[in-house]
Amino acid sequence: MKILILACLVALALAREKEELNVSSETVESLSSNEPDSSSEESITHINKEKLQKFKHEGQQQREVERQDKISRFVQPQPVVYPYAEPVPYAVVPQSILPLAQPPILPFLQPEIMEVSQAKETILPKRKVMPFLKSPIVPFSERQILNPTNGENLRLPVHLIQPFMHQVPQSLLQTLMLPSQPVLSPPQSKVAPFPQPVVPYPQRDTPVQAFLLYQDPRLGPTGELDPATQPIVAVHNPVIV
């Protein structure tokens, strides 16, 4: 901006000089026409001297302005640096200003985590524990010792057998009759037997094997005991550890 201002000032000065030269030439012509030659020469020399002085003065002013512009370009104001001043790490908040209440941010499950949990469930399904079958046991007061040699001891009271007569058909009883062969004990395994709970009364959803315990003994044609009245070995449900 300063350079443009200086250029404008120089142009104005040159224009003024041209005007003055034109005026001086006109005055010289007028004087030469009116006065003798000696006076015209003196006036011309005087005018030329004044013009030279003005031109020199304007040239000096322009040089001074250019020097100041160059100095101002190189010399720029630098920020004041305090050697012992430490920067403030945080903005100082006045005490009158209260912090704004922010809404609580709740964690949410990403869809990738949900897919991983579902894949684990499909790969490693949970084991279903099979319930143990409850075998009915006759109370100790009504229990009788079963002896194949004594037919009277094998007979049980009728009120214990009546609730099971209408549940199991005779066709099932005939197909599920045990053979007359001696019952072999199952091979012993390392699994410890699970004790069966004692039920003081017979249940309706009892298996057919339990029903055979309450059946009346019947004598065959040869006078021997029917195989259904043979004692049944108690079945233990193994527990897998």
Swiss-Prot record:
Which top-level group of life is the source organism from? Eukaryota
Q: Which residues carry this modification: Phosphoserine?
A: S24, S25, S30, S32, S33, S38, S39, S40
PTM comment text: There are at least five different forms found in milk, with varying degrees of phosphorylation. These include form 3-P which is phosphorylated at three sites that have not been determined, this form is present in very low amounts, form 4-P which is phosphorylated at four sites, form 5-P which is phosphorylated at five sites, form 6-P which is phosphorylated at six sites, and form 7-P which is phosphorylated at seven sites.
GO cellular component term of the entry, any: extracellular space
Q: Which residues carry this modification: Phosphothreonine?
A: T27
Name the GO terms of the biological process aspect. Answer: lactation
Tissue localization of expression: Mammary gland specific. Secreted in milk.
Pfam families, alphabetically? Casein
The protein's location, in the record's own words, is: Secreted
Tell me which residues are marked as the site Not phosphorylated: S30, S32
Q: Which residues carry this modification: Deamidated asparagine?
A: N150
Q: Which UniProt keywords apply?
A: Milk protein, Phosphoprotein, Secreted, Signal
Q: Which residues form the signal peptide?
A: 1-15
Recall the GO molecular function terms of this protein's record. cysteine-type endopeptidase inhibitor activity
Show the segment(s) annotated as Disordered.
21-45
UniProt keyword annotation of Coiled coil present: no
Q: What does this protein do?
A: Important role in determination of the surface properties of the casein micelles.
Q: Which family does it belong to?
A: Belongs to the beta-casein family.
The entry's protein name is Beta-casein
* Gene name tied to this protein: CSN2
